[in-house]
Amino acid sequence: MKKILFLIIFLTISNYSLAESGKFNAAGAGSRSLNAMDAGNGNMSITYDGNAGLMDKEPGSIFDKSTMHCIGGLTLVSGKFDDETGMCTFYLMDGEKVYINYKGKGTGGQGGTGTFVIIGGTGKYENISGSGFSSRQNIRGKAGMAHSMNQMSGEYTY
């Protein structure tokens, strides 16, 4: 009887998979196309669609050498915004994807800061969750596009 009980406990433990978790601190640069309605005096509505490449300070992190595609928008009032929202897809080196929703605030033409929530993914990251902080500093580049340095840090579990 003890052997059977031990076998049941052993099989239960050996089939139990522990969730993996980690931290990340990724940075990179990107560009995005803009649609804008300018009402003057620093009042403007903007939507954007852009891409960026990221490297993590920890080589081998799931976000290291990833790219992200983001679609979002914001409304400037007297040159400031506090309503930026959007969604990003991260294309990971292993071929999988991770999705986030984000919110932010900042100053038009300069950049902003915000928070994000990891909402899911594909494959082994299907049930990924997490959250973090992001910042963006606008930089000069090709006319007609917006360009920025991006930084994202946070934690995840899958």
Q: What is each residue range found by the language model?
A:
Residues 4-13:
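Sec-dependent N-terminal signal peptides
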Residues 13-19:
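Sec/Tat signal peptide C-region and signal peptidase I cleavage site
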Residues 19-158:
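Beta-strand-enriched cores of mature, soluble protein domains
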